[in-house]
Amino acid sequence: MLGGIIDTITGSSKQSRLKGTVVLMRKNVLDLNDFGATVIDGLGEFLGKGVTCQLISSTAVDPNNGNRGKVGAEASLEQWLTSSLPSLTTGESRFGVTFDWDVDKLGVPGAIIVKNHHSNEFFLKTITLDDVPGRAGAVVFLANSWVYPADKYRYDRVFFANDAYLPSQMPAALKPYRDDELRNLRGDDQQGPYEEHDRVYRYDVYNDLGSPDSGNPRPILGGSPDTPYPRRGRTGRKPTTTDPDSESRLSLVEQIYVPRDERFGHLKMADFLGYSIKAIAEGIVPAIRTYVDTTPGEFDSFQDILDLYEGGLKLPDVPALEELRKRFPLQLVKDLLPAAGDYILKLPMPQIIKQDKEAWRTDEEFAREVLAGVNPMMITRLTEFPPKSSLDPSKFGDHTSMITAAHIGSNLEGLTVQQALDSNRLYILDHHDRFMPFLIDVNGLEGNFIYATRTLFFLRGDGTLAPLAIELSEPMIQGDVTAAKSTVYTPASTGVEAWVWQLAKAYVAVNDSGWHQLISHWLNTHAVMEPFVIATNRQLSVTHPVHKLLSPHYRDTMTINALARQTLINAGGIFEMTVFPGKYALWMSSMVYKNWNFTEQGLPADLIKRGVAVEDATSPYKVRLLIKDYPYAADGLEIWHAIEQWVGEYLAIYYTDDGVLRGDAELQAWWAEVREVGHGDLKGAAWWPRMDAVSELRDACTTIIWIASALHAAVNFGQYPYAGYLPNRPTVSRRRMPEPGTEAYGELGRDPERAFIRTITSQLQTIIGISLIEVLSKHSSDEVYLGQRDTPAWTSDARALEAFRRFSDRLVEIEGKVVGMNGDAGLKNRNGPAEFPYMLLYPNTSDVTGAAAGITAKGIPNSISI
């Protein structure tokens, strides 16, 4: 058995030796003080006894140690390996390691213990054994984990080979190690507060958004039928003094706890992101406030807004900016915080106005963005006219729409309203019921006047949508009922009425932008995903095939959500400052979550529910679009189908029938915990899959991957390209629609741009808001896109690797299709008047160099990482 590997045996002692390679990254490379540089000095500190490794057998058990796999002798890292090996990513270091390991006695290694005897942590990537008797190919131990000094842990750090095993198939020698590792990650006996090195995944409610001790509380979200919410990761911080149920908050500079391997462990952009958001919150916001206080504080024309991109804004150098320069690594924030002198806030030109500064104002572009904008999942097919409300009549009375056939009849290409309904050509963007219940509270906030809107569209013969009418409704108290006072506006192209119509579209955009940020983006991707991240780490071993399938789609999600709780969605945070629901925003999202349904989050189910597609066995993906040129849906179905095919092929390798799935204890515990704890406020819902069949697991995993990758990409990376020019996507409206005979109406005639701008988002809110979405719309240079993996040896299973290669190839084919459709002049919704091609669901799988960094408005990352 050992004859073929004579070179790994020292002949004299007959003692087998296994040679390995360790790849790690030192902490200070990742500290970014020497940003992007390869740090070679000091590597010697890892040699000698600094880091030790011990192999664990997968085949030979130790009866004196509970029949666990036998543990070999400690081995230390050896010489630093340089140029003879394939090139390394910046900052990676390779070391040799030699193990005394007699395969005849100890069998085949299946796991490894790594101990760090330094004072600093390091990031361990992989340990590879090249020639192991009895094993075809290399043994790769996957880590991708921070290893802290050994005295920080109550247990040994154990890493497993990259083999995939269902619990029932795990080698008996390794089963206790597998169970121990899950117990350590659950940390159910550790209350916290957790420290930086901890690896505990536990749940908590959203009780850390407010600051009760400083008189700024917020409702606790989650744990109550009145305010249900997905769970977040627990930090274990102390409660506030005023409210024992609320968790105390940290200052912005402190790191909020997330399990250590969830924190941005890779290079480049990720830490920059954290610093950028904090720089905006702590430095740029005060500077902008000072600027606005010392100038007229308003834009007067569209050119004033364009100057933000063409010239920049000179901000005063407030003390907070100086402080940040001292505290943050300069390389990271040199763009945001220039070293000295004048602070010029200069923003890149958003794509929506790059080719044509006026196109955003057209009805064609307004309608196109409903199908190919940043929130393209709201439009529904109209099935009755006039549109009805589903609000409770005992509380709201009759909220049936006031839009009549007379408003729209002349723009239906010769059809009657009934004929247009019957031929699937009437559609609605209906924000009326979504916002009406909250408007009395929301309009009580300073600087707000928001309408609840309904917008009707007609599907024209050329495949584009035309807006027919906009209904603006405000709440009106009549006795015990909140009735609606509604006005209907129709398209106009000349005089004051053209500007009235332009304002009507702006009020619609305010609704749509608030829903987009709060629901389509925050709730339906970021918040609902976190329970899946936590449950997967608590209940599925890293060796479980489903853990290997899903874990790339969780990268950085807990970290970005923690950062959001710290600076964006907290009381007084940037979100409350810039989006109209203000302090009611997160509470509103809790009301919406009451009706969240996991099985409706997949794309085909969503399209069918909205009536924009029908089931059709003859169509390629069993779904036929009623709006054929619907870029989000057309590209999305391609992506959905590719994910579904990949997931199905992968699961079939491990689950040969439904019985295997039902007998998988880890998987059943995972699904039960998602349902009963992570999304526990909805645990009684009848729609939850029972997880009795492989088809249910396929659908669930496809949906999880879809939400984390394509759905998030569709709502995130278009933020700055579409909404970076605020007149196109205002986030607030400040006053009511001008009525004939009023001073406001006169102003609209005299100085329409000024009147329009004074109605929408203020200057302060605009500058803060677009500074933020500029950061949030960027791809990092180390982005891992759908169809890519950050570790090529993520599994040893050749069947899984081959299925994944087919998935990647399919995605590259889809890239070609997207480009082809964007070049098809017959598909008018692909580019629109702004000449801005729809690329948000272009996978970018083919980009393996990180070339597409920054604001590209294309590419589907694996995970919600920004």
Swiss-Prot record:
PLAT domain location: 33-161
GO terms, biological process: fatty acid biosynthetic process; lipid oxidation; oxylipin biosynthetic process
Alphabetized Gene3D superfamilies for the sequence: 3.10.450.60, Lipoxygenase-1, Domain 2, Lipoxygenase-1, Domain 3, Lipoxygenase-1, Domain 5, PLAT/LH2 domain
Record-level Gene Ontology MF annotations: linoleate 9S-lipoxygenase activity; metal ion binding; oxidoreductase activity, acting on single donors with incorporation of molecular oxygen, incorporation of two atoms of oxygen
Cofactor: Fe cation
Leader sequence segment: none
Function: Plant lipoxygenase may be involved in a number of diverse aspects of plant physiology including growth and development, pest resistance, and senescence or responses to wounding. Catalyzes the hydroperoxidation of lipids containing a cis,cis-1,4-pentadiene structure.
Designated name of the protein: Putative linoleate 9S-lipoxygenase 3
Organism whose genome encodes this protein: Oryza sativa subsp. japonica
